[in-house]
Design a protein with these regions (language model features):
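Extracellular/virion structural assembly segments
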Residues: 1-220
């Protein structure tokens, strides 16, 4: 049991993907906006479920204390607990076999270029991705993205997939030829930035004193 358990049993999960930006208002009333290019790490605030029996979750408290705000854990949303899959479900029109036929050509800036020349059973109007679909390179690639606009199959051998943040080149990872993961199969590497304490109340129930705040760790 671990952070994954907290997520799987969450009452709610709040997502923060805001870019680093500042606003100022001039004396003439004009709003000026300045943004800084960065990796836009995922941040999550997880409200833990009440009513856990302490005797059943002692190993969870031990693991949370071990992780502290030091160690990273790889987590998913909707794979370990299918009840959360509605958050991450893939909404494009490809089936699993077709997704497995897609390979990566390159990633650069805000675009992921995918090779679809081997994908069978599609037409030029097949919806490959819908806005909000989650996508990640397969294997040991660490960073997930969301698609920002609808992508059709078209007639070429590649498709350009617009993504929510600048593509992250992971050290030691070969992008060209890699497969992709979509939907509930993507993962995040997260660390606690705020770790609540816990207490045991009458009846033997476990209560957390606050929400868990998690941040994506970007090492590249």
């Amino acid at each position: 049991m671990s952070l994954q358990t907290i997520i799987d049993n969450a009452v709610s999960i709040e997502f923060n993907r805001r870019k680093l930006a500042g606003q100022s208002v001039s004396r003439s009333g004009q709003i000026k906006i300045a943004s800084v290019a960065n990796n836009v790490p995922w941040q999550m605030t997880v409200e833990p479920r009440p009513g856990m029996r302490y005797a059943d979750y002692r190993d969870l408290t031990e693991e949370i204390d071990r992780l502290d705000r030091i160690f990273i854990e790889v987590v998913d949303i909707g794979n370990t607990n299918p009840g959360l899959a509605y958050i991450t479900n893939y909404q494009g029109q490809c089936n699993t076999a077709q997704i497995n036929q897609i390979t990566v050509s390159s990633g650069n800036a805000l675009t992921l270029t995918l090779n679809v020349s081997s994908v069978t059973g599609t037409t030029s109007s097949t919806i490959m991705f819908e806005p909000g679909d989650f996508v990640q390179l397969s294997g040991n690639y660490k960073y997930p993205y969301t698609v920002t606009s609808r992508v059709l199959r078209g007639s070429g051998t590649t498709i350009a997939v617009p993504i929510n943040r600048p593509f992250i080149d992971q050290a030691g990872y070969t992008e060209a030829g890699a497969g992709i993961l979509v939907g509930k199969n993507v993962t995040w590497q997260m660390v606690m930035t705020k770790q609540p304490s816990y207490r045991v109340v009458p009846g033997g129930f476990l209560e957390w004193t606050d929400n868990f705040e998690l941040a994506e760790v970007i090492e590249d």
